[in-house]
UniProtKB/Swiss-Prot annotation:
Stretches assigned to the TFIIS N-terminal domain: 1-78
Protein function: Necessary for efficient RNA polymerase II transcription elongation past template-encoded arresting sites. The arresting sites in DNA have the property of trapping a certain fraction of elongating RNA polymerases that pass through, resulting in locked ternary complexes. Cleavage of the nascent transcript by S-II allows the resumption of elongation from the new 3'-terminus.
Compositionally skewed regions (Low complexity) per UniProt: 78-106, 133-146
Name of this protein: Transcription elongation factor A protein 1
GO CC, one annotated term: nucleus
Amino acid sequence: MQEIIKCREQLEKAIKDGEFDKALECLKNAKNFKITKDLLKSTDIGKSVGKLRAHKDIGISSQSKELIDKWKQDIEGTSATTTSSSSSSSSSTTSTTTTKTASPSESLKRKSISEDTSDRPTSKPLLQENKKISPPTTPKTSSPPIASLIAPITGANADLRNKTIQLFVEALTTDNDETMSPPEDIAVEIEAEMYDIYRGVSKEYKEKLRSFKFNLKKNDILRLSLLNRQISVAKFCSMDIYSMASDDLKEERKKLDKFNTEASMLGQNNEATTDQFQCGKCKQRKCTYTQLQTRSADEPPTTFVKCCVKGCGNRWRFC
């Protein structure tokens, strides 16, 4: 028990200090322990390892899942063995007690019966026939769920690439577990496709990462389509911001396009007059607006609006 407690303390310290290599070593050493249900409760190692299944480091989360599954199998196997041995011991004790408590008269009766039937042909007992008909059953154990394990990338830019995969895993994770592919597999494929397209971790690679992560978090339909293989990874990596946008965002952009085309007048600063915006201060719809590209080129422009009502002059902006 002391070894398990020491391993748990070392694991918690390594996680707290950010020493992930030491944490992985502790998880691997924990596989050698003979774990029981009582040990998990008394040492609290089950709680410590269970929390790490959702850790940001892929290696630690994978090893934690693997270790929990192994412990489940060990505990189920121990429970089945204990039940079998206790039932066997109980039946043996009952048989012995019955034999010892038999009265002398019953012994004489059995002796006389055996003498009368000694000349008869012997036959197999009915109990043996029944045993042949119904063979002994073995307790069934549920197989552990198959966890998706990701081998960390090594070589040039390994840290950045592994971080990219982790960000994609977070963006792809949903409450729906019944998907064709786990988020980890899709994240690895997207990163590999981006790395090939942009020939390394370039400026374009990083810009695309930010754009993909933003749109995946905002668009549930796009996220599920990727996880269910309704959209291929290659097609996803070739999509622009307009293709990845959710239906609500597409509708909003259509309105902005309409505002641009229906603008009645342009000022010196390229300001368009419209009645499509309502001022939050005076509640009137006399406004001018202009659009500027304040962020990267693959993101929508920022719209600046000014109320034209005399005495108001309220200003606001939105993306």
